[in-house]
Amino acid sequence: MNINDINKNWDFIIGLEIHVQLDCNSKMFSNCQYEYDNSPNSLTCPTSLGLPGALPNVNQSAIESAIMFGKAVNGKISKNFTFARKHYFYPDLPKGYQISQFDQPIISGGSVPIWWNEKEFKIDLTRAHLEEDAGKSFHNNDSKKSNVDYNRSGAALIEIVTEPVIVHPEQAKIFMQRIKQIVNYINISNAEMEKGKLRCDANISLSKKGSGKFGVKTEIKNINSFRNVQKAIESEIIRQNKILNDRKEVQQATLTWNNDKNVAEIMRIKENADDYRYFPDPDLPPVSLEKSFIEDIKSSVPILPFDYEKKWMNEYNLSLNECMILSSSKDIAKYFEEVVSLDVSPKKASTWVSTELFRLFNEMNTAFDSSKVEAKDLKILIDEIKRNKITPNSGKEVLRALFETGKNISEILKSGDFDSSDINTTEIIDKVLSNCQNEVLRYKKGEEKLIGFFIGQVNKETKGKVSHEIVIAELSKKLKD
């Protein structure tokens, strides 16, 4: 049974806990550095290893990042907050507890708008709080040994917790993609999932359709790709549906995603909710921020993707799909806005940026870089086509030359065989019609589809340098005579 069939009888209740590793120069509570590719246990210090007598210090850069995120999601930013110890035992947690936040997080509430099935949904947040990351365990089943790399231990994280308002696995995937987009826009994390910088825990329960009652919740831990977020939740929904249809009870459980088997597998059954025995960290005093400090940080938050999307749909009349492509990164959005600011039609700008320019970057398999084709050069190119100085096809060749050579557009237009101003279109059309008398007679007798044949013949003569509109207009006029 597929997800949509299950959804006819059951409501899906999904909440996410997303961990984003912040791009700070040092760890959350020490001056120790963290970089992904360093050799194991080469970036550690007494604090990140939990050695006796080592005292933590709060990373100010992490606090600034959290304030920016709070502003981006319209959450309540607390001037006063505390850190707490979250106790659990695992080899990658050397202190026996994690420094996190409990009843006084830095960010409360807020929401994140997403698009799903071409409708806007606001995903409400419970909170976002700062904490330190754990180390990383490596299990070798052949040697029956486990190793731990403590380089990541103590790295700065922001954990984003949603309300249980996500109603479909695909929504969960889209929400996680939006979080990555937001943290990229505000420049607090590159959120590279392949490096573990964006991870997700998913809480799932099923409720009888329309009952409004929560079912028994299970949790899938450490999902590390957008595709797997959706697949893991779907797998757990299918499992819970089977249990409930067999008139059995779902048990509280912690699961992990097995990518090889394409299924979420139970790690352990929980009889009760986890008791982490939170209490305020005695080594970290309460933090109190000045209002002016918070306001300064908030003022640095740029225009966000959902702001661009609404503006472009309302003011530029672009489609949702166009807007989502153009807002996919801050650099692309700013580039598009710059092109439009040069008095280029938003529709034309959208087509050239999201279709033609993107094609060139995709061919090179490189990220968008506005310096490859400057906005002012793209404006000149679009204007040349608008004035029928060059054809759209020639424009694509000019764009490629700009992209590949970095030359000035004026130089490319002069050196290339693009200009159609010296072509006598009327003379060429007369020649084509003179050579195709039989086709002209057939056209005049009602075979109007032959217009395509004539256009093709003219384009052969002009090598496609004359605009389609001019060719059609001239041909239509001549064929009426």
Name each model feature, range by range.
Residues 8, 317-318, 340-349, 387-390, ...:
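Structural motif
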Residues 23, 238, 333, 354-362, ...:
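Amphipathic alpha-helical core segments of compact helical bundles
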Residues 369-379, 383, 389-460:
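Strongly charged, low-complexity linkers/loops
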Residues 322, 335, 345-353, 377, ...:
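Residue-level detector of well-ordered alpha-helical segments, enriched
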Residues 342-343, 349, 357-372, 380-385, ...:
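M16/insulysin-pitrilysin zinc metalloprotease superfamily fold
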Residues 1-303, 320, 341-345:
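Basic, nucleic-acid-interacting segments
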Residues 196-208, 276, 313-337, 346-363, ...:
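Core structural elements
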Residues 150-155, 193-200, 209-212, 418-481:
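C-terminal non-catalytic interaction appendages of large macromolecular assemblies
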